[in-house]
A protein has these predicted regions:
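Membrane-embedded alpha-helical bundles of multi-pass transporters/translocases
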Residues: 1-178
Length: 178
């Protein structure tokens, strides 16, 4: 059903995220923390901007590839006797809506640690709360006309909201100039 296809779709998106977004975010956090502790904000911003560019450079083509070849990816990874063509097609719509948000989720995995590196967990937490509320509201609005696709789209919109607020908060911090 819808719950299962959402779960399969999200797992596939998380697989893609785990390959590069989580890896890059995990690798740069200690370096960002060290630069922030030494108040080397020029180097801090250079590293953060480079990570953002790399993330966009990877995420955008992966998103397009996934949108075009999503059916083949889902079939390759999940199709079996119990996961038939109908399951593939149900998962495909949700997967496409999830993948539209890949760039935003990937950027959030890079930008949020930049705040943590500066010992500022409040702003990414606030952005997360705002996006969580947005996710619930958009899911409630979109679930009836779009079913599971609406829930997946709501998550993408919420991820975009989170990214926007993280960038707004970065602009307000003197130490972050991205």
């Amino acid at each position: 059903g819808i719950a299962s296809s959402l779960q399969y779709s999200l797992r596939l998106q998380e697989l893609v995220l785990g390959i590069f977004a989580v890896s890059i975010g995990t690798v740069i956090l200690p370096d960002l923390s060290g630069l922030a502790a030494e108040k080397k904000y020029g180097e801090f911003n250079t590293m953060l901007l480079q990570a953002i560019k790399i993330m966009a450079l990877i995420s955008i083509p992966v998103t397009f590839y996934s949108l075009v070849n999503g059916k083949e990816l889902i079939t390759l990874i999940y199709k079996s006797k119990s996961f038939d063509e109908e399951s593939v097609m149900l998962t495909l719509g949700e997967f496409r809506y999830h993948m539209i948000g890949l760039l935003f989720i990937a950027l959030n995995r890079i930008i949020a640690p930049a705040f943590y590196a500066q010992k500022n967990p409040k702003l990414p937490t606030l952005a997360g709360i705002i996006s969580f509320i947005g996710n619930i509201l958009f899911a409630l609005i979109l679930v009836l006309p779009m079913s599971g696709n609406g829930i997946a789209l709501a998550l993408t919109i919420a991820s975009f909201i989170n990214t926007v607020f993280l960038f707004i908060f970065m602009k307000k911090m003197e130490s972050m100039e991205v």
